[in-house]
Amino acid sequence: MSHYGGNPRGNSSHQFGRKDFQQSDSKHIPKITGQPLPNEVQIPFDNMIYETRNPPKFEKQAKFISEYCINYDRKLQLGRMRAKKFHDKLPPNNLSLDLGKGFETFDPKEGDEKIIMLLEWINQMAPEGGRLKKVIHEADVVCWRGLITKICSTIYNKEEGWRIDAIKRKGVIFLCEEKTEQAKNRDLNQTDLDKRMSYWGHKFEQYVTLDDDAEQPDTSSPVTTKEEYAVVFRNDLQTDQRLNPEKRSIGIFYSGEVDCLDRHGNMLELKTQKGELGHGFYKYSKSFKWWLQSSLVNVDHIIVGLRTQEGHVKSLTSLRTREIPQRASWNFRAGFEFLSTIFTYILNCLEKDGDACVIEYRSEMGIHKGIQMRRVPVDEFDFVPNEFLEKFC
């Protein structure tokens, strides 16, 4: 069943301000099909996007392709044999889970792997000399789910900038998010409290999940993010017809991590939230991100640990993904409309193999002037290695 539903327009003006509802910029969006793009383009933002009643640009539920696990040594294994299970015998109330416990021994994943694990999955599934597009189910674009979420949520989270590198190889567009200078500076200036709060979510996962053969969670071992369970999906995103009326849709092949499985083998996401999930929660971009992350990989339920300001989970509650938009002030269709515009610009820019570009949202310039795309030499990017490409015809 689809996760799309609820109020098609939302109630965005109450939370995000009337200044977002200025006259539409759609008349300024160029019809660029068949015309060479300049080396640099400022991508206009259409304010009327918030009011859209159009059908969702993702027309249907995503198609499940595969699943895989990554072990502590960062080796990919096909299947779900290492996926964590949700500890459903944990009482939902009167809990006292200290999310700060073990912070000093935290064992995080190091470095930026870019899209290497996604390429490794493709590599393991592909025969030598085969056709790349066949392995990715004839998709046009390969990326992480997180990149899709980041772009979609921009319209309700304008303070967070992003940069995406894009390259076309073997007829496929590969997308990879790069850290902006803003993000790098934010990391450098993290306080001890910032670091501890970013740890809390990982500790929560340890408290409420267990290995397949265990009866109780192991909460004494160091928390690590080096082990993962992830899924692979494909979906079709309608193009922005103002930009490319000749191509109806863009096939997107993407992967994302999933936190755990329930007793029936269904996927679950785990989140923490300060206080209660009251009306205010549904006004903010956090609820939009939660919904995006889950709906893109067909997760039906989100388990939420309700915590204190000091980082102690007192109770658990469950959200049904498909019901979140019904209570929200945001319009999920607007996020998909924005994604469609960005992806259509990329599609139009990368016409032939070896074409490359950077798309960047500079939040300090504002959403009306800060979305820019520029062509770059192909040798600026190394996130799709030649050794990977050489396997395919």
Swiss-Prot record:
Instruction: Supply the EC number(s).
Output: 3.6.1.-
Region span, Disordered: 1-37
Q: Does the keyword Nucleotide-binding apply?
A: yes
Q: Which reaction does it catalyse?
A: a 5'-end NAD(+)-phospho-ribonucleoside in mRNA + H2O = a 5'-end phospho-ribonucleoside in mRNA + NAD(+) + H(+); a 5'-end (N(7)-methyl 5'-triphosphoguanosine)-ribonucleoside-ribonucleotide in mRNA + H2O = a (N(7)-methyl 5'-triphosphoguanosine)-nucleoside + a 5'-end phospho-ribonucleoside in mRNA + H(+); a 5'-end triphospho-ribonucleoside in mRNA + H2O = a 5'-end phospho-ribonucleoside in mRNA + diphosphate + H(+)
Cofactor, free-text remark: Binds 2 magnesium ions.
Binding of Mg(2+) 2, residues: 205, 257, 259
Listed A to Z, the keywords are:
Hydrolase, Magnesium, Metal-binding, Nuclease, Nucleotide-binding, RNA-binding
An example of a Pfam family matching this protein is RAI1
Q: Which cofactor does it need?
A: Mg(2+)
- Detail which positions bind substrate: 74, 113, 144-146, 257, 271, 293
Q: Give a GO biological-process term.
A: NAD-cap decapping
Molecular function terms in GO for this entry? Answer: metal ion binding; mRNA 5'-diphosphatase activity; nuclease activity; nucleotide binding; RNA binding; RNA NAD+-cap (NAD+-forming) hydrolase activity
Which GO cellular component terms are attached?
Answer: cytosol; nucleus
Residues recorded as binding Mg(2+) 1, renumbered to this chain, are 205, 259, 269-270
Q: Where is the composition biased (Basic and acidic residues)?
A: 17-28
The record, for InterPro entries, names: RAI1, RAI1-like_fam
UniProt similarity note: Belongs to the DXO/Dom3Z family.
Q: What does this protein do?
A: Decapping enzyme for NAD-capped RNAs: specifically hydrolyzes the nicotinamide adenine dinucleotide (NAD) cap from a subset of RNAs by removing the entire NAD moiety from the 5'-end of an NAD-capped RNA. The NAD-cap is present at the 5'-end of some RNAs and snoRNAs. In contrast to the canonical 5'-end N7 methylguanosine (m7G) cap, the NAD cap promotes mRNA decay. Also acts as a non-canonical decapping enzyme that removes the entire cap structure of m7G capped or incompletely capped RNAs and mediates their subsequent degradation.
What is the name of this protein?
Decapping nuclease dom-3
Organism of derivation: Caenorhabditis elegans
